[in-house]
Amino acid sequence: MTVMTDPMIAARGILKLLGQTVDEEDLTLAHESLDYGYPRTAVYCGVAAALQAEAPIAENFRQLIINEFAWPEAELKDVMDLLEHIPLKAA
């Protein structure tokens, strides 16, 4: 069992929210990454799954993804690039 740190809890919540618009089957890699203790990787995989599914993400949810983690600069750029190509969900 993985120890639940603040980033782990945040990632689990983000994946739960993504699961409302992305099939759970498409989030398998994200959940596996989280189970292995990699919350940022889990969120990245979840965002990639949302892009592939063309699932819209609201602006406040985008900000949560960006601001909830201490992203290394290169990873932050990758996440922002993915988010840029995902449709914006109307509030």
PLM features: what roles do these ranges have?
Residues 2-91:
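C-terminal-biased regions
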